[in-house]
Regions:
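Conserved N-terminal catalytic core of the sugar/cofactor nucleotidyltransferase
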Residues: 1-7, 15, 29-107, 111, ...
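A short, conserved acidic/glycine-rich loop-to-beta-strand motif
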Residues: 126-136
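Catalytic-core segments of class I nucleotidyltransferases/pyrophosphorylases
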Residues: 48, 102-104, 111, 117-124, ...
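Histidine-centered beta-alpha loop that forms part of the nucleotide-sugar donor binding/catalytic region
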Residues: 10, 56, 135-136
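A structural signal for short hydrophobic beta-strand segments in well-ordered beta-sheet cores
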Residues: 27, 145-148, 199
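Acidic/His-rich active-site region of diverse nucleotide-sugar glycosyltransferases
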Residues: 86-88, 143-159
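Conserved catalytic-core motifs of eukaryotic protein kinase domains, centered on the activation segment
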Residues: 18-21
Length: 206
């Protein structure tokens, strides 16, 4: 798969700070490997080797571990934020890397095992500006939920609802295939998130 990917790796991991200290969340180990290394492996296993990562909090350990990606069978470039830009704002910083083809976005601080080819194929079939991977959660109270229509388009988002508002258990995984045209709605140099800012704008635009 010739698609490029952006890894969002700027997270501080405040809830883990008592355990991890100053270590950035993407470098938190899981079974002996940093979380972000598992994301890089997932991309490589799916044939994606051209990767850009957005960095914010304490980037030095990440840069030291990964370098240019040669030791991991990929090519890694970096965009370091001077101030927090949010998920979409950070990815906007990578548009010179992305070019004019659909691209993949993943989190660098969450481990998953996912068929990225299937997601890319569904995106190509749908003609959507954004295609997101969803997960059926056994504990929907903890996450932002996505309510789809019958055709697979998004009807609405519900952020960490109480039980009486739980109408689905489908969770936004933070894994997306995005058309570059969708990123035109993201302002340059401003904090802007996918779930709370960009996706509602896309829904309003139809």
């Amino acid at each position: 798969m010739g698609m490029k990917a952006v890894i969002m790796a700027g997270g501080e991991g405040r809830r883990l700070k008592a355990v991890t200290g100053e270590l950035p969340k993407p470098m938190v180990p899981l079974l002996g490997k940093p979380l972000m290394e598992r994301t890089v492996e997932l991309l490589r296993e799916n044939g994606i080797t051209d990767i850009c990562a957005t960095l914010g909090y304490n980037p030095a350990p990440i840069l030291s571990h990964f370098g240019g990606g040669e030791d991991f069978g990929v090519h890694l470039s970096w965009r370091i934020e001077d101030k927090p830009l949010g998920t979409a704002g950070g990815v906007k910083n990578c548009m010179d890397f992305i070019g004019d083809e659909p691209f993949l976005v993943l989190s660098g601080d969450a481990a998953c095992d996912f068929d990225l080819h299937r997601l890319a194929d569904e995106h190509a079939r749908s003609g959507a500006a954004v295609t997101m991977a969803l997960y059926e959660s056994p504990d929907p109270l903890r996450y932002g939920l996505v309510v789809p229509d019958a055709d697979g388009s998004v009807r609405c988002f519900i952020e960490k609802p109480p039980w009486e508002r739980v109408v689905t258990n489908l969770v936004n995984t933070g894994i997306y295939v995005i058309e570059p045209r969708a990123m035109e709605l993201v302002p340059e140099g401003e904090s802007f998130d996918f779930a709370s800012d960009l996706f509602p704008k896309l829904m309003d635009a139809g």
